[in-house]
From Swiss-Prot:
Residues that hold ATP according to the record: 221-223, 484, 536-539
Root EC class: ligase
InterPro entries (UniProt xref): Aa-tRNA-synt_II, aa-tRNA-synth_II, aa-tRNA-synth_II/BPL/LPL, Asp-tRNA-ligase_1, Asp-tRNA-ligase_1_N, Asp/Asn-tRNA-synth_IIb, GAD-like_sf, GAD_dom
Protein name in the entry: Aspartate--tRNA(Asp/Asn) ligase
Quaternary organization: Homodimer.
Site (Important for tRNA non-discrimination): residue numbering on this chain: 33, 83
Entry's Gene Ontology cellular component terms: cytoplasm
Localization per record: Cytoplasm
Reported function: Aspartyl-tRNA synthetase with relaxed tRNA specificity since it is able to aspartylate not only its cognate tRNA(Asp) but also tRNA(Asn). Reaction proceeds in two steps: L-aspartate is first activated by ATP to form Asp-AMP and then transferred to the acceptor end of tRNA(Asp/Asn).
Organism the protein comes from: Rhodopseudomonas palustris (strain BisB18)
Annotated keywords: Aminoacyl-tRNA synthetase, ATP-binding, Cytoplasm, Ligase, Nucleotide-binding, Protein biosynthesis
Length: 590
């Protein structure tokens, strides 16, 4: 018999009754039923009930066991007594009568119990992550993550893609976040950077004559903590293709992502044919570029009904051309109590309030706005929005670029409060036609709005002759249930267009050459049209595991202060290490 096991803890069935077996694992739970000891033994594969009575030669050893001790158990498989089956376990019809126990690894007092799913402070969970990972739900999430990545790889290869590995040590480049820098010992005063994404390398692969690249790529960004992103690193399904259009990328990737979701959606419906929503339309309808399409509410511009009306606040605003009034329908929200609750919520979000109209059973509008604009305008708003008696509409006004984010929050809030969101489905969509540039209010300059390597719609002509803030890019995102899960674009593969695109964003040609020298040189020697995308593995896994916390699907994550509490990173290093790197610390005063 094998030194440690003849079977795993998830393997035994009724067909194994009367066999002598050996299992090894952790003591998951120990129960004393009046002299009868039950030990639930757990390993990676499952749970097996083991039992010892005073007649067992191993009874005294069994009495000494404690939770999470690692043991080897020998014994005979027998049928559980009638009425004690556990149908929640694959091994739930049998148990092992213990004849011998060997302690392989005793455990001290546990700072974090493994049995059960009690909530514990995050810092305790991260410091003792090896215990946390033994817990069933987190353990299963990690296994699901591995299976999702396997599904991605399989589907990419079925689409004719080939997996490559690109360098981890590379050059620093401006890609939207701070780099993690790695000092060079051989070249004092110079630094490598960990890649924020394999962007340049995957484009260089296309210029090297390869096609249909993919990689499950680690990416590193030195960003301030955010609720929807882990500090430090994340993984993406990185993709690039040659001689393709935007539609070709969509045709290749839609079945991959749809298939992965269908594999792990546990029967929840998944969008079959994805809608394509222009960025500007997404903002107007949903107040965000990552809409949750499970929420049926669509906002509309109702400015014409308030222009010159008796509601002077909105009427005066509309005298300025850039201002608008948007309506957010609230089906079923036509009660004074609900409207007042939404108004209070808006004030809690820093707004002066949230104007509303309710429609009574007779069809007449009610509320301060309705009283001010009169029944004719109120009826026209109701007709435009397709509302009925018992419904309401809420209004935001001013410069849309200033209020759009709040309008999106209000739409989300209404969908949740009115139970309009179907939580049991996955709604996927393409968001297209992103602006190439945006105005950076902090730096008072035009900046790239997304990927700086994207092709502008209209090409060089647009870069030379259009107002930069009106140029659209061949840039696209994939959204699911209110999350951006992928982003991509068709690349700018002509060197003169690349230089001009960066020039508009304030980078001179020499700076482009200095920062992107490898790619700039490659563009001089025949670059094919190419494009691709990157899908966030972590966010996809998070959605499919049904959690809102990325730490619940990551093996050894950092905390929100970018600290690895298990390994003690970031850590001090020795003076000798600093001398070898020619680094002298100049720390801020506390």
């Amino acid at each position: 018999m094998h030194r440690y096991r003849s079977h795993t803890c998830g393997a035994l069935r009724e067909s194994d009754i009367d066999q002598t077996v050996r299992v090894s694992g952790w003591c998951h739970r120990i129960r004393d039923h009046g002299g009868l000891l039950f030990i639930d033994l757990r390993d990676h594969y499952g749970l097996t009930q083991c039992v010892a009575d005073p007649d067992s030669p191993a009874f005294k050893d069994a009495e000494k066991l404690r939770a999470e001790w690692v043991v080897r158990i020998d014994g005979k498989v027998r049928r559980r007594p009638e009425g004690t089956d556990n149908n929640d376990l694959p091994t739930g019809q049998v148990e092992i009568f213990i004849t011998e126990i060997e302690v392989l690894g005793p455990a001290g007092e546990l700072p974090l119990p493994v049995f059960g799913e009690q909530e514990y402070p995050e810092d305790i969970r991260l410091k003792y992550r090896f215990l946390d990972l033994r817990r069933e739900k987190l353990h299963q999430n990690i296994m699901t993550r591995g299976a999702i990545v396997d599904s991605m790889r399989k589907r990419m290869k079925e689409q004719g893609f080939f997996e490559f590995q690109t360098p981890i040590l590379t050059a620093s480049s401006p890609e939207g976040a701070r780099d993690f820098l790695v000092p060079s010992r051989i070249h004092p005063g110079r630094f490598y950077a960990l890649p924020q994404a394999p962007q340049q390398y995957k484009q260089l692969l296309m210029m090297s004559g390869f096609d249909r690249y993919f990689q499950i790529a680690p990416c590193f960004r030195d960003e301030d903590p955010r609720a929807d992103r882990l500090p430090g690193e994340f993984y993406q399904l990185d993709v690039e293709m040659s001689f393709i259009t935007q539609d070709d990328v969509f045709a290749a990737m839609e079945p991959v992502i749809t298939g992965v979701f269908e594999d792990f959606a546990k029967g929840k419906p998944v969008t079959k044919s994805w809608p394509r929503i222009a960025y500007a339309d997404s903002l107007k309808k949903y107040g965000t570029d990552k809409p949750d399409l499970r929420n049926p509410i669509e906002m509309q511009n109702v400015s014409e009904h308030f222009r010159g009306s008796g509601f002077k606040v909105f009427a005066r605003m509309l005298e300025e051309e850039r201002n608008q009034v948007w309506a957010i329908p609230g089906p079923g929200g036509g009660s004074r109590a609900f409207c007042d609750r939404m108004n209070s919520w808006a004030q809690g979000e820093g707004q002066p309030g949230l104007g509303y109209i309710m429609w009574r059973e007779g069809g007449e509008g009610a509320g301060p706005l309705a009283n001010n604009i009169g029944p004719e305008r109120t009826a026209a708003i109701r007709e435009q929005l397709g509302l009925k008696a018992g419904d309401a509409a809420f209004f935001v006004a001013g410069d849309p670029s200033k209020f759009v984010r709040f309008a999106g929050l209000a739409r989300t809030r209404l969908g949740e409060e009115l139970n309009l969101v179907d939580k049991e489905r996955f709604e996927l969509a393409w968001i297209v036609d992103f602006p190439m540039y945006e105005y950076n209010e902090d730096d008072k300059k035009v900046d790239f709005s997304h990927n700086p390597f994207s092709m502008p719609q209209g090409g060089m002509d647009a870069l030379l002759n259009q107002d930069p803030l009106t140029i659209k890019a061949f840039q696209y995102d994939i959204t699911c249930n209110g999350f951006e899960i992928a982003s991509g674009g068709i690349r700018n593969h002509r060197p003169e267009a690349m230089v001009k695109a960066f020039e508009i964003a304030g980078y001179g040609e020499q700076e482009v050459v200095d920062r992107f020298g490898g790619m700039y040189r490659a563009f001089q020697y025949g670059a094919p049209p190419h494009g691709g995308m990157a899908a966030g593995v972590d966010r996809i896994v998070m959605l499919l595991c049904g959690t809102n916390n990325l730490r619940e699907i990551s093996l050894f994550p950092m905390n929100q202060r970018a600290e690895d509490l298990l390994m003690g990173a970031p850590s001090d290093v020795t003076p000798k290490q600093l001398r070898e790197l020619h680094i002298r610390l100049n720390l801020p005063e506390n």
